[in-house]
Amino acid sequence: MNILDKTYYYFIGAGGIGMSALERFFKSIGKEVAGYDKTQTELTTELIAEGIDIHFEDNIDLIPAGINPENTLVIYTPAVPKDHSELNYFLVNDFKVMKRSEVLGEITKHTYNIGVAGTHGKTTTSSILGHILKVANVECTAFLGGIAENYDSNIILNGSKYTVAEADEFDRSFLRLSPKLAIITSDDADHLDIYGERDEVKKSFQEFAAIVEEKLFVHKGLPFEGAYTYGVDLDADYDAHNVRIIDGHYVFDVKTPNGSLTDVGILLPGHHNMENAVAALAVADYMGVPHDKIKEALSTFVGVKRRFNRFEANGKIYIDDYAHHPTELNAAIRSVRELYPGKKVLGVFQPHLFTRTRDFAEEFGQSLSQLDSLILLDIYPARELPIEGITSNWLLEKVNLNEKIVSSLEDSLANIKKQDFDVLLTVGAGNIDTIVKPIKEWLSEA
């Protein structure tokens, strides 16, 4: 089956960040795109404005009339429950039904695919790489797991000879890809609800590395043989060094296997983003992208929404970040401390998933203890049911701070207003993003 032969593409879970990139791709090649999601969001509103027909009630009567088993591909995410009426309607009536990861694998397998994997950093790294290739006018489509600020989109469309795909370890989705090149930014344990043991996560990354056809690029220190390494001051194959801060931004030189680049500048804050930039630079250099184009792209990449987005008003600094794993929290807090030494930092954290909170409770406690004060929100369940005893009050006991409280999301802004802080940091992967705009409005008025 040629996946591009259908007329209609119907998405169950249409508001998901990975799903919507596929919707935009099919729309861009002239296909009819429709779908369902349980929640109306800013993203679904944008998709509807782009001509994608989305409804928000699980009701087979709302499926567009022209859809039939011959002309339609149905795409769903693993988060969709087994008793979903529309999904079962399509299964019973012999529609072709595929997971998002399978579809991404089919779209990219006939291209020169570059997979970007890793427990942390893959969205930013794939977005930077997609931007470099766009600036260099390489015929490439990049499927992203976040909204790249330069394009206000989670897809960069510029031809289909090459593809960049965020290679997600959840549900072992990345094993559906056929990458010629790949980056692995990290292999930390996560998704233990899927993998069970921490070693199983690392084993899965080894399986991904084994399917890379041409060359693998990994952060220096990761256990992958035969790969190019990258890092910052790590004497890696691609190594950033002579790091300095000019006008508030990182500037550095990069040693490569065959030469060097000097005075490379990035706009993104944080040591981890310097590493992400070097990873993307390494692949672009290997692909033969001219160094002046690489430097131009890195100096103009603005960032990804909810990846350390900064806002300043009336003497207060506000940063919003997607961090939802202890390693990511450490990176975000480290970046705040680097940028704003001596400032009082208030963190607002929404734990994501009961299983992740349980499995990494000690690490979360240590990470959050690096703040000056903490508002800990209720756990965002996503696809999970509650686990007895695993609550935000339980997690709060593991945080070594004098100033700490638990709050509902609804009461969070009122609680923030009562706090004394110089820097406010909101972090989490659930629906904490719904308070970002109200916080900015309040800070602007204060």
What are the roles of these predicted feature ranges?
Residues 71, 411-442:
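A glycine-rich beta-strand to alpha-helix segment
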